[in-house]
Design a protein with these regions (language model features):
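ER/Golgi luminal nucleotide-sugar-dependent glycosyltransferases, focusing on the catalytic module
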Residues: 1-198, 202
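Single conserved hydrophobic/aromatic residue that forms the stacking wall/gate
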Residues: 199-211
Length: 211
């Protein structure tokens, strides 16, 4: 029931770290699951219990709603140590279970998190590497809404309608309404924010989400 007020810096990474530091590991290790979620997504479009029931049935250490698929053609941010963008759970929603919360690897990760100065740091020091790092340590992960690697790298933004209709993804990116026309044409197959709006506010979907 605590609300933490902080200076708006360090992006979502520092918000998560601030909350972790204030609660402390002694309290956090008692949690069954810890959710790290930011405000770059909107929803829910569908009842969240669908997603939680589905993921609760899986033997995992951490999970997310969506993932960014591997991009091997370099590092556009210049901050990712492996030189490319690994497949990763997107940081707008990551749930971490007790098996991982109480691990020294997870605790050391946050205790030693470096300063986040800009968006490139947020991606390179956390989002792009988090899944790869902990997966290689043996922690099991998955995502709820997965369009498949062959579809595109960023389906929650570039295939929003398909994610909602075919995968019942409960969230969509706020940035869907702030895309330039160049991006709409080249990345989202001509899908417009208006089309997404009609899906989001359509009567069957709206009633299902609030029921």
């Amino acid at each position: 029931n605590n609300v933490i007020e902080r200076e708006n810096k360090g992006f979502d990474v520092w918000a998560y770290k601030t909350a972790i530091d204030q609660y402390g590991w002694e309290k956090l290790v008692k949690f069954d699951e810890m959710i790290m979620m930011n405000f770059t997504i909107m929803g829910p479009v569908y009842p969240l219990n669908e997603m939680f029931e589905c993921m609760d049935a899986k033997d995992l250490d951490f999970w997310g709603v969506t993932k960014f698929h591997k991009y091997e053609n370099g590092d556009p941010f210049g901050t990712i140590k492996v030189g490319y963008i690994p497949e990763h759970i997107q940081s707008h929603f990551i749930a971490v279970r007790n098996s991982m919360i109480k691990s020294k690897q997870f605790q050391n990760y946050w205790n030693k998190m470096g300063e986040i100065n800009d968006y490139r740091d947020a991606v390179g020091k956390h989002e792009a590497m988090f899944t790869k790092r902990f997966s290689e340590m043996g922690f099991k992960w998955d995502v709820y809404a997965d369009m498949g690697e062959e579809y595109n790298n960023h389906p929650i933004l570039c295939a929003t309608r398909e994610m909602i209709e075919k995968k019942r993804c409960p969230f969509f990116k706020r940035r869907s309404f702030m895309q330039s026309y160049d991006n709409i044409i080249s990345d989202t197959f001509g899908q417009s924010a208006l089309e997404l709006s009609l899906i989001h506010i359509s009567e069957p979907t709206r009633q299902e989400a609030i029921s």
